[in-house]
Amino acid sequence: MPEEGSGKEVPFVCLTSKEYREEEDQDSMSSKPKSVGIIGAPFSKGQPRGGVEEGPTALREAGLIKKLQEQECDVKDYGNLSFVDVPNDTPFQIVKNPRTVGKANEQLTRVVEEVKKNGRTSLVLGGDHSLSIGSISGHAKVHPDLCVIWVDAHSDINTPLTTTSGNLHGQPVSFLLKELREEIPDIPGFSWVTPCLSAKDIVYIGLRDVDPGEHRILKDLGIKYFSMTEVDKLGIAKVMEETLSYLIGRKKRPIHLSYDVDGLDPSVTPATGTPVPGGLTYREGLYITEEICKTGLLSGLDIMEVNPSLGKTPDEVQRTVNTAVALTLSCFGVAREGNHSDNRL
């Protein structure tokens, strides 16, 4: 495929995770201690089920910060953002809570931008997945060349005009894509949003509940995705190889991983708002984060839709929270094969 503006064929080079690491320069994340900025985003108005705002506290109480520090991460906790419900937040057509969701994301954008300007990997603890509008927008203000890996049972790419539920946690990607700019009406609360991604900048993994309108958008825009059918057919190793080759095979750039825990099978993460059977296994979920970590290019991470109130038993809550913590730790270097410090006796 010709490189844009070059007028000639450019050979496609597929780098392995090891080669990505070897090519990192002295300023890369892989050549110095991992610096993490944690932002708690206790927000639920992008969907109808209460309890997802408890996610950040549950993850911290599970020892996330201490475990990151034990992994030799330099951690700064920015605390929980304080979100305010906008009064008289009437629906826009059927879109619910537009002003409240828009304001929350604008607030998150500013904080993520600050974290990135401070040179830290942003770690947003959700909260519902509508917050990725702010998380990715803030990241893109500092790293406009970023790419996104979106792990989810859902594509979250409904527009305000195609949505059948009106829930904004099913629409964030449509606000972020430049190709859909003309499909987004002027919604109260979102005048600040500037699309920051092109269709070629995102890859989905784990899809298995996609609305017809969303499927049309994915196909029309040529967006790369691996539904669970492709995961089953190819295996997660091939999926990750193709994902990384597609996004960073030609040029290294920052990776933003937006991870909805409902991407995993409900047997693994039952305490979430929109579980869908037939999802990623625990092992597949960790393989994704391990491979992204190995690139040394992870620059932003969202852990979304942990809802402790939806676990039917304490075990279901603990299983979901512990899995979310494990995914996060894996992003920052905890490997199933084991780890050791570079410090020698």
Positions of PLM-derived features:
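Residue-identity detector for glycine
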Residues: G5-G7
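Catalytic cores of soluble, metal-dependent hydrolases
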Residues: F12, S17-Y20, E24-S44, P48-L123, ...
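Short, well-ordered beta-to-alpha junction loops that form the rim of enzyme active sites
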Residues: P42, G126-H129, A153, L207, ...
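Active-site histidine-anchored catalytic micro-motif
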Residues: K117-T194, T295
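Short active-site oxyanion
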Residues: R120-S122, A199-V203
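Short, structured patches in soluble enzyme cores that scaffold and shape functional sites
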Residues: W150-A153, L177, D201-D209, S227-T229, ...
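Active-site-proximal loop/helix segment associated with metal-binding centers of metalloenzymes
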Residues: I187-W192, R208-F226
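Aromatic-lined glycan-binding groove of carbohydrate-active enzymes
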Residues: A199-D201, R208-E214, R250-I255
